[in-house]
Regions:
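Family-specific signature for flavin-dependent thymidylate synthase
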Residues: 1-205
């Protein structure tokens, strides 16, 4: 009887880690092939978890992201607080104007006074402050970080590292900068556009 064996794997990893073994397999079975080696580029993003969710949809890339499962934001390493990324639509001056706003970041945070004069930025600050307070209180109640993280906001800062070939980065830019399939998410665009410009400057595109 004739038997055929099929091996499915990540060829990119095999070529990097076991090139001699791969060549031996090809020679033994008489397979004719023409390997292509394409430049791979690693990029480190500092962004929010909403943007990282968009970026991580590019599954051809090799992504790594900081974990909220084991990070305890009540510890000194994180200065006992969560870190929030400011959305693209809020500029620095607007945020500065609200540094001493009427938003009361305290345990009386549940609408402690009249909010009729609040604007969208007040509500945004208030919402994230409520989330931080609830997260810390859940930890005090004995919840583990991996349970308490369920209520962390999409504005939460994250570190994201992506490694991809130039062709995969081109696909990334098609969607996240050039909008070939529809308008890019505005926060994703703000992250991706400077990278796109840098790739062009270096002649990668």
């Amino acid at each position: 009887d004739t038997h055929e064996t099929f091996v499915t794997t990540n060829l990119r990893v095999i070529m990097e880690m076991f090139p001699d073994e791969l060549e031996q397999l090809v020679n033994i079975h008489g397979v004719s092939w023409d390997p292509r080696f394409e430049r791979r580029i690693t990029v480190h993003f500092t962004t929010d978890r909403g943007v990282s969710a968009e970026a991580n949809r590019h599954r051809a890339n090799s992504p790594m992201e900081s974990s909220t499962r084991y990070c305890n934001f009540s510890k000194g390493k994180f200065e006992n607080q969560i870190t929030i990324c400011v959305p693209e639509e809020i500029n620095d001056q607007q945020l500065k104007d609200h540094e001493t706003s009427s938003v009361d970041i305290s345990e009386n945070i549940i609408l402690p006074h009249d909010t009729s004069d609040w604007c969208d930025i007040d509500w945004w600050i208030w919402g994230n402050s409520c989330t931080e307070l609830a997260y810390m209180k859940l930890l005090e109640c004995g919840w583990t970080p991996q349970r308490a993280r369920r209520i962390l906001p999409l504005d939460l800062k994250t570190e994201l590292i992506h490694t991809a070939t130039v062709s995969d980065w081109k696909h990334f830019f098609d969607l996240r900068v050039l909008g070939t399939t529809g308008a890019p998410h505005p926060d994703m665009y703000e992250v991706a556009k400077p990278l796109y410009d840098e790739f062009q400057r270096r002649g990668y595109l």
